[in-house]
């Protein structure tokens, strides 16, 4: 193909894309993961919203709130509720004449505490402050000082949402936020809403942080099939009128509910199905488009899960994937066998292996993320042992993990 033909082909592709998203989409952004719908579109989380708001409530009158940690698996509404409650709190505070700073930080995308502070600073920084929050070039203490100065000068209270807080290298940020008022760094009350997929995150906090970061905890359960169907039904105005076949939403909901009720996955699957229909220049989105889109959604979901894992979690996952790949006649592997291959992975990568107990903990964390599954077995001497199985395609894990 010469350059003119290539140019014409590219123009042809772009010409199929309208401002709204082709013939299929009307408002494609409604299916984006970070889209926060209005309250009447939030499904199955009324009780959780009320409880979180109750803990944060005093902030709207400028009083110290209770900080909280929200736990739960991916796609169960944790981030959505945190964002929604902080948004409503800001509006209610404004109605009462209280200037409330609110900011959201995805810690998986932050490169550490300094970057997280920089992102929060930019979110709350009014143009007239004259304070700068560069992406690099200043110390962590300087980022803190600049955040404190903005809060002290322009606000009466503050909320910070730390999504995927377990992805930070340490809990120093929680420690500093919890002690900011006590040590005189800041004159306004600060409420922290931390969000984590890891239910044992608190166990990894230092004793100092546990003592200082007084908080309440909530665990969000996965959505069921009916709730996911309602969530998707509430997002159908992402599509042009009449383009969705009747079976598309029930099928997408059933697929997602079967795999631990992940609403993010359901929306991603529906969005990809619409994209697939657009690529085919189809008039309607059919169930067959869901089938085609599912493979892409699976790869993206797994990549999202493992991209934020620390190196040794990836090493353990690769060990389990290698066992699965090399022993197609077996599904389950004992901890000691996984550890043997883990040691080989560490040797190849030049990493110092962790202890056997820590290896077991990392396997259990993979189970919590539903990358792996576990079961208990009984040996000849009536002793118990654990076995693990990979819940994803081994070839995909090996490709993405490396």
From Swiss-Prot:
One of its GO terms (biological process) is DNA replication. Signal peptide: none annotated. Belongs to the CDC6/cdc18 family. Involved in regulation of DNA replication. It holds the Pfam family Cdc6_lid. ATP binds at residues 223, 235. The gene is cdc6q. Keywords: ATP-binding, DNA replication, Nucleotide-binding, Plasmid. This is ORC1-type DNA replication protein 17. One of its GO terms (molecular function) is ATP binding. It comes from Haloarcula marismortui (strain ATCC 43049 / DSM 3752 / JCM 8966 / VKM B-1809) (Halobacterium marismortui). SUPFAM superfamilies: P-loop containing nucleoside triphosphate hydrolases, Winged helix' DNA-binding domain.
